[in-house]
A protein has these predicted regions:
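Alpha/beta-hydrolase-fold enzymes
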Residues: 44-142
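Conserved alpha/beta-hydrolase "nucleophile elbow" surrounding the catalytic nucleophile
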Residues: 17-22, 187
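Short beta-strand/loop motif that positions the catalytic acidic residue
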Residues: 178, 184-186
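Catalytic active-site module of serine/aspartate enzymes centered on a nucleophile-bearing elbow/loop
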Residues: 199-202, 207-242
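Short alpha-helix in the alpha/beta-hydrolase fold that links the catalytic acid
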Residues: 167-171, 180, 191-203
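Conserved acidic catalytic loop of the alpha/beta-hydrolase fold
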Residues: 1-17, 26-29, 36
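Active-site nucleophile elbow and catalytic-triad environment of alpha/beta-hydrolase enzymes
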Residues: 138-139, 154-174
Length: 242
């Protein structure tokens, strides 16, 4: 609704294509349902009409990491320092789900952070022994510097509660009511929104086609494989005179 208000304020009366991935893809579907008179086409990427139990479960683990950090203080941590350990761990869990086993194997393998160290010097409790561990810890602390823990909780819960059928009827009927041209884009190695879900979404929409990004980079591929995504989007827009 806020996006629609902004569009009206800017004098935008028609939208040629609403495109978005992940949470953005959920908003794409809502645009088509809430403002069909404005939207000419949609392109949801690696998303869902309703969050799967797999995604909900991963989000819950991340939220538990935050709320079990003593520094969370029931959400009232402002002025006292936010729950850095919990938010960092939540981010690390998320990073694992954004990529794939193939991408991690290719990037890190079993490489050690300090390859010059002798293996006989290792201890069971060694921290940051492997490069992948160091990478995850870095990504976790990087998010802590620029993101609010409570925002993480609410955004992840909003994704879990997302359900285009809520208040509208049964899912098949709701999806089929979207009549504008649609392009559903899946990612071959996405473990959050696997390709079978994307094909089902395309099948359920009234006038949709399906395309797939072939990549080892998991869910994040739509932020990495620009050439493939550009080719897919351009082809769809050309085919539909957009």
């Amino acid at each position: 609704r806020v996006q629609h208000v902004l569009a009206k304020h800017l004098g935008i009366r028609r939208v040629r294509a609403v495109i978005g991935g992940s949470l953005g893809g959920m908003q794409v579907l809502e645009w088509a349902l809430m403002y069909p008179e404005i939207v000419r086409s949609i392109m949801p990427i690696g998303t869902a009409a309703g969050h799967s139990p797999w995604c909900i479960g991963l989000n819950e683990i991340a939220r538990e990491a935050i709320t079990n950090d003593p520094d969370w203080r029931g959400g009232d941590y402002y002025g006292k320092g936010q729950p850095e350990r919990g938010l960092s761990l939540a981010r690390q869990v998320a990073m694992m789900s954004y990529r794939s086993d193939v991408s991690f194997l290719s990037r890190f393998g079993r490489d050690r952070r300090r390859p010059e160290e002798k293996r006989t010097e290792e201890r069971f409790d060694s921290a940051n022994l492997f490069q992948v561990e160091s990478y995850l810890h870095y990504q976790g602390m990087k998010l802590v510097q620029r993101f609010d823990a409570n925002s993480y909780l609410y955004i992840s819960r909003a994704m879990d509660l997302h359900d285009v059928a809520f208040g509208r009827g049964e899912m098949p009927g709701v999806l089929s009511s979207i009549r504008c041209p649609a392009l559903c884009i899946g990612i071959s190695s996405d473990i959050l929104y696997p390709v079978h879900e994307q094909r089902e979404l395309a099948k359920g929409l009234g006038a949709a086609t399906y395309a797939e990004i072939d990549s080892p980079h998991g869910h994040d591929a739509f932020l990495i494989e620009y050439d493939q995504l550009t080719r897919i989007v351009k082809g769809f827009m050309k085919d539909h005179g957009l």
